[in-house]
Each structure stands twice: as C-alpha cells, then as structure tokens.
Regions:
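Acidic (Asp/Glu-rich) sequence patches and key acidic residues
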Residues: 1-242, 246, 258
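Short helix-adjacent coil turns
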Residues: 248-253
Length: 258
C-alpha cells in the first residue's frame, strides 16, 4: 500500500477529480490502472455529484472551523472549496516518509543518522522515532500521526472527524511549515531551490526500465533491499515542501492518501 501526498480542495479529492502520479504515468504510457483501498478492495466509483460533495465538504469545513476558533478571537476564515482549483500530488511512499522522520529524530537527539534503511521497514518502531513521537516537549504533527493539514497560519494539532466520519489527527499548514523549516535547519540548511529539486534528483534507486515498446523490465537490475537514508529523506522532504508551498499559495488543505 503506497503513500501519496495531495494538496488541493477536498471537493476535488472526494469527487475523485484528481489522479495520482502513478495514474498519470499509466495513462501517458497506455497502461490500465486500478486503485486499491487499504482493505484490499478496488476503489469504489459510486460517488455523489461534485455539487453534493462540495456542499458536504463546506458544511464539514464550517463546523470544524467553528469548533477550533478561539474565544475572544476572530473566527477562522473558510478556505475556498470547488471542483476546479488546481491540485498538487506526488508519491513519497512509506519508506521515504519514514526516512524523513528518522533524520528528524536523529538530528533532534544528536544521534548519528543510519546510512541505510531496509525496504518496507517499520519505521514507527525505531527507538528514536518512537521517542520523538511521545516527547511532550517537542510536538511534531508529522510524528503524532497527522494525515491532514488545514490552510491556517496558527499552529495546533487535534483529533477530529473527517467528512467521512473517520477520526484522525488534523494539523495546520502553519504548523507544518515550522516543522519543515526546523527539520531543514537541523539536517541540511538547504536553500529553497535545492529543496525543491530533491524530488527530481534524490529518492529510490531504479528497479526496472521501460523499453521502446513500453514494456517494463527488471532484467539485469538487482532488486534493492536497502535504501540510502539521506536520499530518501530529502526526496520525501522535497515533496512535503512542494505541497506546503502549493497549499499556501492556493489556500487548500494537504492530506496523505493511502
């Protein structure tokens, strides 16, 4: 089960009016593609109309913003919802997301960063990641299981219901920016152009090739069972930074799709 990051309106997301980078690649290269949900079933195409989705999402948005608004402070302004605004998406997958957390945890506690991580590793069980996830003096939404970040400048984290009634950890763009800036300062001190480029220059090693006939082949390429920790961390970090910048500019949420 892969991990995609999405920045865009919730109306587009719940109307399925967006395509993962794998879907986009498949269509461009003439392949069929079926999304599989976390329970192993094909994604359900039965859906409300975009108009109905937008109404439901706006109702949810207004209730959430009312619930988290602070006494004696102006209420939070609702972000715009529609089915047309552009979106950003990319695919860090779990190993790179975990590598990013590992670098953050190692740098936070001044421990050496392991040079490699295992393919399909259970990153939440790493002692330093687990330590930072429960550190009451250092609360990072990325370590507390947040999967949604709302387009608000204030920093906070709360458990709340989604429009689907599932309960998840929800944070804010303002908080995510502080966390990403903190991680960059701890680990790399890279300028923004460098950060934005990592999604194209770092990441997973090649496990196969596509020949001139469009056929995918793993011939002559050994399967990788270990990955470079820093390269994967930079790869995921770049995608989160890109999503954050896009979400700030467009005033849309970020969410993790898996």
């Amino acid at each position: 089960m892969g991990l995609d990051i999405y920045a865009g309106t919730l109306t587009r997301y719940y109307s399925h009016n967006w395509k993962t980078v794998v879907q986009q690649w498949a269509e461009e290269n003439g392949y069929s593609f079926n999304r599989i949900t976390p329970d192993g079933e094909p994604a359900d195409d039965e859906e409300l109309s975009p108009t109905d989705v937008q109404a439901a999402v706006e109702n949810w948005r207004d209730q959430i913003l009312a619930a988290i608004s602070q006494p004696d402070q102006p209420p939070y302004a609702p972000w715009p919802e529609n089915n047309e605004k552009p979106y950003y998406t990319d695919k860090p997958d779990w190993d790179a997301f975990g590598a990013m957390l590992l670098v953050a945890a190692c740098r936070t506690y001044e421990e050496p960063v392991p040079p490699t991580v295992e393919k399909d590793w259970i990153f939440g069980e790493h002692p330093l990641i687990a330590r930072l996830a429960s550190d009451e003096e250092r609360v990072w939404s990325l370590f507390r299981g947040a999967t949604w970040w709302l387009p608000l400048t204030d920093s906070f984290l709360f458990q709340g219901p989604l429009p689907t009634d599932d309960t998840v950890a929800i944070a804010t763009l303002g908080g995510l920016r502080k966390e990403l800036e903190r991680l960059n300062q701890l680990a790399w001190q890279a300028d923004e152009d460098t950060i934005l480029g990592w999604a194209d220059t770092e990441g997973y090693p090649v496990d196969g090739t596509v020949d001139s006939d469009g056929q995918y082949s793993k011939a002559d390429i050994p399967e990788h069972t270990q990955y470079d920790t820093q390269s994967l961390a930079k790869f995921a970090f770049s995608m989160f930074w890109r999503a954050m910048r896009f979400a700030e500019e467009q005033q849309v949420p970020i969410l993790l799709d898996y």
